[in-house]
Regions:
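Glycine/tryptophan-enriched, flexible segments
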Residues: 1-128, 132
């Protein structure tokens, strides 16, 4: 099981097509939070840019670190609250926290319901039907 040495070596090389070359681990995750919130002040305009896909700073790009446990939603929340005290509270700070809450909701929802979230009957187990609305 696992990767061969060649596969692992290839996977470790940065992909030139990547907007943001991810580096794993807590140190890289904390550096990203610092960069995004404090160095570049991207949080100030997060609401306007959050759905952009191409640029390195359009969205927070915290997902990979959150998913792997290198970064906690609690830490991000605390940093956003500190940002609100030291810089400003605005629609962007609200939305970053709001989306962290949604992330946790769906994470725990999927833990509770497992693969049922992917079945046609969904979590309720009801048969799927086409509703024709004129």
């Amino acid at each position: 099981m696992g990767y061969s040495h060649e596969e692992a070596e290839h996977a470790a090389k940065p992909d030139p097509r990547s907007v943001l070359p991810f580096r794993g681990g807590e140190t890289a995750a904390l550096a990203r939070v610092k960069h995004y919130l404090w160095d570049k002040d991207c949080l100030r305009v997060y609401f306007e840019t959050r759905n952009g896909m191409i640029g390195a700073d359009y969205s927070s790009k915290f997902s990979a670190w959150l998913a792997h446990g290198c970064l906690s939603p609690r830490y991000i929340h605390a940093e956003v609250k500190r940002y609100e005290k030291e810089r400003e509270a605005n629609k962007s700070t609200y939305w970053l926290i709001f989306e962290l809450i949604w992330r946790d909701f769906f994470r725990f929802f999927c833990l509770k319901h497992g693969n049922n979230v992917f079945f046609l009957g969904g979590t309720s187990g009801r048969d799927w039907q086409v509703l024709l609305v004129p």
